[in-house]
Amino acid sequence: MIKAKDYIDIVLPNYNSSRYLKQTINSVIMQTYKKWQLIIIDDCSDNKTLNLLKKFHKHKKIKIYYQKKNYGAGFCRNLAMKKSKSPYIAFIDSDDIWNKNKLEKQINFMKKNHYSFSYTYYKTFGLKKRFITPPLRFDYKSFIKNTSIGTSTIMVERKKLKNRKFTNSKICEDYYFKCKLLKRVNFAFCL
């Protein structure tokens, strides 16, 4: 029997992301760590994206919720976090692809070191292919000087999120969330 304390809820906001969405979802499904649930909040997407999402309706580990109006990524992430019941929350965006052992490595790193907030290195793709190497440790002051924590690399203990939410602004909603979270946990650590 899988213990609830080992579960990770994965938050995925989606809006008209048909180009990479299938790859994004499959990168979660293919994780070597199997104790997860994917919570997708669709933000009033076009028919092409909705048809793609329909292919995942029957997957027992994927929950999809549909908005009737476009509210933005911050609103969608907050709604998914509200629906989350697991002790850990990870974030992925609809145009990001995880390595297959991302969750396994990250949760083991957090548990072994008793960390409540972690992030990873990441690689961009598309026009500008870069390997992003963030510092090994961030506190609030160092983060506002160097904002290199990718949202799709974050895993956090749910209990540390108390009243920490994404703003509903159309830009920088993830930056403000990370700032508020770092004030609460003091430090975040890089795997």
Enumerate the language-model features and the residues they cover.
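Conserved donor NDP-sugar-binding/catalytic core segment of glycosyltransferases
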Residues: 101-131
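Acidic helix N-cap motif at the loop->helix transition within catalytic regions
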Residues: 20-22, 47-55, 97, 101
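Short aromatic/hydrophobic "clamp" motif used to bind/position activated sugar donors
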Residues: 89
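Conserved nucleotide-sugar donor-binding catalytic segment
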Residues: 135-191
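Short, well-formed alpha-helical segments that are part of the catalytic scaffolds
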Residues: 17-30
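Glycine-rich, basic loop-to-helix element that forms the pyrophosphate-binding segment
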Residues: 67-84
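Cell-envelope/extracellular polymer assembly enzymes that use nucleotide-activated donors
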Residues: 6-9, 27, 37, 176
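A conserved acidic beta->alpha catalytic loop
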Residues: 42-51, 69, 93
